[in-house]
Swiss-Prot record:
It comes from African swine fever virus (isolate Tick/Malawi/Lil 20-1/1983) (ASFV). A motif (DEAH box) lies at residues 215-218. One of its GO terms (molecular function) is RNA helicase activity. Residues 110-262 form the Helicase ATP-binding domain. This is Putative ATP-dependent RNA helicase QP509L. InterPro entries: Helicase/UvrB_N, Helicase_ATP-bd, Helicase_Restrict-Modif_Enz, P-loop_NTPase. Its EC number is 3.6.4.13. It comes from the Viruses. Induction: Expressed in the late phase of the viral replicative cycle. Belongs to the DEAD box helicase family. DEAH subfamily.
Length: 509
């Protein structure tokens, strides 16, 4: 049997394959079907969602190239799809890499050498996945397509590529740019595009690229985004992710079919000291009751109810004031002009405006940046993001902030609403490689004691303990939205401790 080895994967004549397998053909296809696991409270249409590791195009059925070994029993003879790739200009440029980054670059480069290769890099948040990928681009010297989930990450890639490889022609591919001129691999060496725009392009657009980099590859599980895999089955694909196997519905297998199992590098030796300030907040009875939809507790609706409590909003403002006074006093004490940054995380967008208005009343002379609002509302996103790199206070939603946003001067987080998932990525916003490890990281975690969501704090404790952060507990209420009575409830150096009155460390060691 003959197959086509092409940019769309391994193509085998549908009728010939069906004839070869006969009555086993249906069972064979079913084995390559992935079904999402049903989760408590999950909508039925999501719980029964199915995706396949193959696609039909004309008379051929296409499989990911990584499944080639499964077809050796068919005595397949591959016919390579002819693709002529140009070579990028070779200019000797050097930029520093940490030892663990250089080791991973060497490993990836070897894996991606011709005729084809796949690599799925698993590297924790803030440890330099982008820089590793740029080093691979420099080594392979092929026209490269970088696919990202958001405009903010696109801008960061453009900035980093321009800084590290200034001799290459780099372009951002988005709707606005494409209306002005056609952006292709003939005119540019590296194109950085947002997946929402790129997935609409025909296969011919992708064919001239010698390398595709998928940033935040774990997010390609959705039915719409997953379709792009059939357009980018090129010779070399590099996937990047901080949480490659973290999907609770089990749909990670879709990406693994195309990229292979994630490969993790050795963790760097840089560590960031920090501590957690856990505030047990007793809210007003009118706002802490769970909100049920279809007889089940709705986390989103319950959080929305919690934030209708004006005292709880004031608590976040008070904690921001407390951190800000620490952050402005310490630089003055040590003779520097760089205040530490505070990120305030909320669950959804409408809360950004609520907290922005509340904070603006208290910080009249301080620039509070909400880059997400500018991006989502069609504002001057480049300006907003540029301002955010020097801002003292940034407001973000969890969903936006967990996606590779890089602000190296940020050292503190206030979790204004409860959170369970993606905590490692959230904490990664203040532990980025190359930032000042001498500054103590501070996490303010508000536990709504009377809410059914209060149990989520134990999932967060697991991540804090993994980081080695001591946990200090204090209390507040709707009658007094000022935290007090701070006691140590977990000490990484004395895990048997129950409570003490130990004082948290100063923001500067």
């Amino acid at each position: 049997m003959e197959a086509i080895l092409s940019f769309a994967g391994i193509g085998i004549n549908y009728k010939k394959l069906q004839s070869k397998l006969q009555h086993d053909f249906g069972r064979f296809l079913k084995a390559l079907t992935i079904t999402a696991r049903a989760l408590p409270g999950q909508p039925k249409h999501i719980a029964i969602r199915q995706e396949t590791a193959f696609t039909l195009q004309g008379e051929y059925i296409y499989f990911p190239i990584l499944l080639r070994k499964q077809f050796e029993m068919f005595n397949i003879v591959y016919t390579a799809h002819p693709v002529s790739l140009r070579t990028l200009p070779c200019v000797e440029t050097e930029f520093p890499l940490f030892n663990y980054q250089q080791e991973m670059v060497d490993k990836i480069h070897k894996k991606l050498l011709p005729p084809y290769g796949r690599f799925y890099l698993h590297l924790n948040t803030g440890l330099g996945k982008t820089r590793i990928a740029i080093s691979i681009i420099q080594k392979l010297l092929y026209p490269t397509l970088v696919i990202v989930p958001t405009k903010a990450i696109q801008i960061q890639w453009i900035d980093e590529l321009t800084l590290l490889l200034p001799h290459l022609r780099v372009a951002a591919y988005n709707n606005a740019a494409c209306k002005k001129k056609d952006i292709t691999s003939k005119e540019y060496d590296v194109i950085v595009g947002i997946i929402n725009t790129l997935r609409k392009k025909p296969e011919a657009f992708f064919e001239p690229f010698g390398l595709v980099v998928l940033d935040e590859a774990h997010e390609l599980h959705s039915p719409e985004n997953y379709k792009i895999f059939w357009k980018i089955q090129l010779s070399r694909i590099l996937g990047l992710s901080a949480t490659p196997l973290d999907r609770p519905d089990g749909m990670d297998k879709i990406i693994i079919h195309h990229l292979g199992q994630p490969q993790r590098t050795v963790s760097p030796t840089t560590t960031f000291s920090g501590y957690v300030r856990e505030i047990e907040y007793q809210g007003h009875p009118d706002f802490v009751k769970p909100v049920c939809i279809n007889e089940k507790v709705s986390a989103i609706a319950t959080i929305d109810k919690l934030l209708q409590d004006p005292s709880r909003i004031q608590l976040v403002v008070n904690e921001t004031k407390r951190l800000y006074s620490l952050h402005t006093a310490e630089p003055q004490k040590w003779g520097t002009n760089e205040p530490y940054g505070i990120i305030i995380f909320v669950e959804f967008r409408k809360l950004l405006e609520i907290f922005y208005q509340a904070l603006s009343k208290e910080f009249k002379d301080v620039e509070i940046i909400v880059p997400e609002v500018a991006l989502l509302c069609g504002g001057v996103s480049n300006t907003a993001l540029s301002q955010a790199h020097s801002a003292s206070i940034i407001l973000l939603t969890y969903g936006y902030g967990r996606r590779g946003i890089s602000f190296k001067h940020m050292t503190s987080i206030i979790m204004a609403t409860p959170r369970r998932n993606n905590m490692e990525q959230i904490l990664g916003r203040i532990t980025r490689q190359g930032s000042d490890e001498k500054k103590v990281r501070i996490v303010v975690d508000i536990k709504d004691t009377l809410s059914p969501l209060s149990s989520q704090v134990y999932d967060r404790h697991r991540i804090y303990k993994k980081k080695g952060y001591p946990i200090f507990k204090c209390s507040a209420s709707y009658q007094q939205p000022y935290s007090s009575n701070e006691v140590l409830i977990w000490d990484p150096y004395n895990e048997s401790c129950l409570a003490s009155t130990t004082t948290p460390p100063s923001p500067s060691k």
